[in-house]
Amino acid sequence: MADLDQVLAEIRRGTDEILLESDLLEKLKKGRPLRIKLGADPTAPDIHLGHTVILNKLRLFQELGHEVIFLIGDFTGMVGDPSGKNSTRPPLTREQVLANAETYKEQVYKILDPAKTRIEFNSSWLEPLGAAGMIRLASQQTVARMMERDDFKKRYASGQSIAIHEFMYPLLQGYDSVALKADVELGGTDQKFNLLMGRELQKAEGQKPQAVIMMPLLEGLDGVKKMSKSAHNYIGVSEPANEMFGKIMSISDELMWRYFELLSFRPLAEIEQFKQDIANGANPRDTKISLAKEIIARFHDAAAAESAHQAFIDRFQKGAIPDDIPEVELAAGEGLAIANLLKDADLVGSTSDALRMIKQGAVKMDGEKIDDSRMTLSAGTVAVFQVGKRKFAKVTLV
């Protein structure tokens, strides 16, 4: 039982909730390889560190000898998951979904062992259902049950539309578990309703209900919103090592511990020792460097991690301007306002962001801080602009 206790401790690490843990324990006690399912709708081409929280747990099950299925929702991706959304998602075309699916496979193999990963597409069983099968599936749940979802409840209360096909999404995801005869399904906390639907449909089909393991949603670089491309607070697993290093070093010291908990493979005792060292006066920056190097070595290699560390020292700690900054040519017209220049050069997301950064003293032109938010630049200007510690661009106005 000691070994089983250790396995459970590894599985529990970083999880938000396991439903039901007694079911999971019963399955593990049987000693056979379990069928572990993780589904992902390829709605965007890039996988970021937020996605890897669950993928890391899936990798653990591979290492424990279980059968791992990475399910690509090529069918459900065209429906659109309503989880956490305050409006109906625009549907993707089959071509978009399949193109994104190809990049998903390449990226997940940075984490999962390809030889131990079974890839499935849910169109294999959802398309053959046809109209009769879909109606039969829909008959297994009620509108009242669907309206128990917080996101649907809020949208209904605020007068936002809810499309009928959105009610189908949890049923389709749940049916995936029936088709695969899943023993365990992994998902984020925002997927709870969908994950539990799998248990209900499996019971209805006479199967043993899957255990559900929910992982927390990783906060993005801002430490507030969940990591996502739309929030511009993400680190993509395919980003260059130098870019990844700089982004990780930009997170707050408090958020660093959250990243250690959900992204690091270090023993918990070692992470606790880091905390103790900082309490005793160690510099949190050095601990953050250890985190950055660990993550970069995983998605690139150890040499890339060391190189990125050195580049970070040269660029930020010694104040050097990087050699590979983008060069941008902009039309000056009768004069280009500094806020518009920074936005057009992709150094900020909006002119209001530019004004805020200038006010904070975070904008430089050729190394000199810009204090005048109303500055206008004319044609012929050639200068290196810097926003914060990491963003540079050489701008030529014509």
From Swiss-Prot:
PROSITE patterns linked: AA_TRNA_LIGASE_I (PS00178), S4 (PS50889)
Keyword annotations from UniProtKB, A to Z: Aminoacyl-tRNA synthetase, ATP-binding, Cytoplasm, Ligase, Nucleotide-binding, Protein biosynthesis, RNA-binding
Motif ('HIGH' region): 42-51
Binding annotation for ATP: 229
Domain S4 RNA-binding: 336-397
Catalytic reactions on record: tRNA(Tyr) + L-tyrosine + ATP = L-tyrosyl-tRNA(Tyr) + AMP + diphosphate + H(+)
InterPro entries, alphabetized: aa-tRNA-synth_I_CS (IPR001412), aa-tRNA-synth_Ic (IPR002305), Rossmann-like_a/b/a_fold (IPR014729), S4_RNA-bd_sf (IPR036986), SYY-like_C (IPR054608), Tyr-tRNA-ligase (IPR002307), Tyr-tRNA-ligase_bac-type (IPR024088), Tyr-tRNA-ligase_bac_2 (IPR024108)
Any one Gene Ontology molecular-function term assigned to this protein's record: RNA binding
Subcellular locations according to the entry: Cytoplasm
GO cellular component: cytosol
Pfam families hit by this protein: SYY_C-terminal, tRNA-synt_1b
EC number: 6.1.1.1
GO BP terms: tRNA aminoacylation; tyrosyl-tRNA aminoacylation
Short motif 'KMSKS' region, span: 226-230
Binding partners and assembly: Homodimer.
Family per record: Belongs to the class-I aminoacyl-tRNA synthetase family. TyrS type 2 subfamily.
Entry function: Catalyzes the attachment of tyrosine to tRNA(Tyr) in a two-step reaction: tyrosine is first activated by ATP to form Tyr-AMP and then transferred to the acceptor end of tRNA(Tyr).
NCBIfam families: tyrS
Annotated protein name in UniProt: Tyrosine--tRNA ligase
